[in-house]
């Protein structure tokens, strides 16, 4: 993840996939070509450590169940590891409409970005 880069101070992930193993067993893998090692190596949910930087995870309440579950699971995983994390479901948002919350100056995602920036700027 880019969050590990030394110049990155914080992150925001929107409607992500944090465990690639289900993808490896789907039709999508015909194009991706993931093997078990690549799936594990590139799945944040499978890591036993992570960057000690703030990460906000957001997902729409109208997203696919897999996206909501993986986002919630990843937030819990980071919390267990003692890593700074927030989790939020955007009411009524799906994989496309959730971006409206970033396009609007008063949108919830815009607010989260602003808060992350304020917390991490020295």
What residues fall within each predicted segment?
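Primarily recognizes the serine-hydrolase "nucleophile elbow" in alpha/beta-hydrolase
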Residues: 1-31, 39-40
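Residues at alpha-helix caps and immediate loop-helix transition turns in enzyme cores, especially N-
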Residues: 24, 67-70
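Short beta-strand/loop motif that positions the catalytic acidic residue
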Residues: 51, 57-60
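C-terminal catalytic histidine-bearing segment of alpha/beta-hydrolase fold enzymes
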Residues: 58, 69-75, 79-122
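Active-site nucleophile elbow and catalytic-triad environment of alpha/beta-hydrolase enzymes
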Residues: 32-48, 53
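Loop/turn elements at helix/coil->beta-strand transitions in domains of secreted/extracellular proteins
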Residues: 7-10, 53-54, 83
């Amino acid at each position: 993840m880019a969050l590990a880069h030394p110049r990155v101070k914080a992150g925001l992930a929107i409607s992500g996939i944090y465990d690639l193993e289900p993808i490896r067993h789907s039709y999508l893998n015909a194009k991706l070509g993931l093997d078990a090692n690549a799936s594990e190596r590139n799945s944040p949910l499978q890591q036993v450590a992570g960057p000690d930087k703030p990460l906000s995870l957001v997902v729409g309440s109208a997203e696919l169940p897999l996206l909501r579950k993986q986002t919630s699971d990843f937030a819990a995983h980071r919390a267990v590891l003692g890593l700074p994390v927030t989790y939020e479901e955007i009411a009524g948002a799906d994989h496309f409409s959730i971006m409206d919350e970033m396009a609007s100056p008063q949108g919830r995602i815009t607010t989260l970005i602003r808060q992350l920036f304020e917390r991490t700027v020295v």
